[in-house]
């Protein structure tokens, strides 16, 4: 049997993953990770957790500790607050300030969970493997989709290196979410009925723009209808708006919904178009960088991609360039492919890796609208 350190988050998924590993006879060690401190990081605006006697992360640790005791495994905790700030959060803020929409979960997996946390588990505890409660499958350094397609998290793991995946176990990869809940309830685990977390845990129920205002000052400007060149509203900061966004525009009295098609940060303008004008949002190829390709054994005629989580697969052709850059073609077109987001590449069930979307195009024209 192996010595396995598992990331215990205080949620039902990692709880069941730890339980299953223990049932299999492994030596299991729970490790709780904290990446955020609201006071240290000046996270004040709209942060209701500051008024609570027990902050959400401490509640999660208590839940994880109760589960560890039930299962009969030790649990430890480790802080990566500075590392998260330096490697993930400053990157996140810089991307927003430059007009991109990054994915913090992918950055956290790349720099913290499967780097700092992974190395700590191996070096501190002498672990043979590191386990997580993700819905994905790692096998011989390769990454595959989780069996439960509605919960598959391979998209978020596209920047994890193959050398790391060789020592990673995802006990839930071959399971449906309903089965995970059933096991938790039958084992009477403390987290059996705990609600699934969504989004970035330390933001809580706040709007993401409210959270960002702690770190990126508001820069009010105008909202411009790209089809008429007329000002139709005002905004608090162009960098807060993402391609394809419909909610939060506060455009009253319009005949139909509008969506964001671009912005000009220098002129402090956000450009929108009516929902019926899909051409302003549709691209058919993209340029991406920072490619992490874990598997070179694939059928180039069978490639598909996801441009965001829980999106349907899109058939693509990929042109591999130098310096970890790629061009990806999808001739039928797709709406709201967003610069800054991750493109995940697949060959059937195998997730080959991913890259960060830099530019999007319709034929020869870059979709970067201005007036």
From Swiss-Prot:
Its EC number is 2.8.1.13. Keywords: ATP-binding, Cytoplasm, Disulfide bond, Nucleotide-binding, RNA-binding, Transferase, tRNA processing, tRNA-binding. The active site is at 108 (nucleophile), 201 (cysteine persulfide intermediate). It holds the Pfam family tRNA_Me_trans. It catalyses: S-sulfanyl-L-cysteinyl-[protein] + uridine(34) in tRNA + AH2 + ATP = 2-thiouridine(34) in tRNA + L-cysteinyl-[protein] + A + AMP + diphosphate + H(+). Disulfide bonds join 108-201. NCBIfam families: PRK00143.1, trmU. This is tRNA-specific 2-thiouridylase MnmA. The lineage of its organism: Bacteria, Bacillati, Mycoplasmatota, Mycoplasmoidales, Metamycoplasmataceae. The gene is mnmA.
């Amino acid at each position: 049997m192996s010595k396995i350190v598992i990331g215990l988050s205080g949620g039902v998924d990692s709880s069941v993953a730890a339980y299953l590993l223990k049932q299999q006879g492994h030596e299991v060690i729970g490790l709780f990770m904290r990446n955020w401190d609201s006071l240290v990081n000046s996270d004040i605006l709209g942060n209701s957790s500051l008024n609570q006697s027990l902050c959400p992360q401490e509640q999660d640790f208590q839940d994880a500790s109760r589960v560890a005791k039930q299962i009969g495994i030790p649990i430890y905790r480790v802080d990566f607050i500075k590392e998260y700030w330096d490697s993930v959060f400053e990157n996140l803020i810089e991307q927003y300030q430059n007009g991109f929409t990054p994915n913090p979960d992918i950055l956290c997996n790349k720099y913290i969970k499967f780097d700092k946390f992974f190395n700590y588990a191996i070096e501190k505890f002498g672990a043979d493997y590191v386990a997580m409660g993700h819905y994905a499958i790692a096998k011989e350094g390769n990454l595959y989709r989780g069996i439960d397609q509605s919960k598959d998290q391979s998209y978020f793991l596209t920047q994890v290196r193959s050398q790391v995946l060789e020592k990673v176990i995802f006990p839930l990869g071959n399971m449906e979410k309903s089965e995970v809940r059933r096991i938790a309830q039958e084992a009477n685990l403390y987290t059996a009925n705990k609600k699934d977390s969504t989004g970035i845990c330390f933001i809580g129920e706040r709007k993401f723009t409210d959270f960002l205002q702690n770190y990126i000052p508001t820069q009010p400007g105008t909202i411009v209808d790209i089809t008429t060149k007329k000002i139709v509203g005002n905004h608090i900061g162009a960098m807060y708006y993402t391609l394809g966004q419909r909610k939060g525009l506060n455009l009253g009295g319009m005949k139909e919904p509008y969506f964001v098609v671009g912005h000009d940060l220098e002129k402090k303008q956000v450009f929108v178009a009516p929902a019926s004008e899909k051409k302003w949002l549709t691209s058919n190829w993209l340029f991406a960088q920072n490619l992490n390709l874990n598997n070179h054994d694939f059928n180039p005629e069978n490639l598909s991609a996801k441009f965001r989580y829980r999106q349907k697969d899109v058939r693509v052709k990929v042109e591999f360039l130098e310096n970890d850059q790629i061009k990806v073609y999808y001739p039928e077109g797709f709406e709201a492919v967003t610069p800054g987001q991750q493109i995940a590449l697949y060959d059937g069930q195998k997730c080959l890796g991913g890259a960060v979307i830099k530019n999007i195009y319709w034929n020869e024209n870059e979709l970067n609208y201005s007036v």
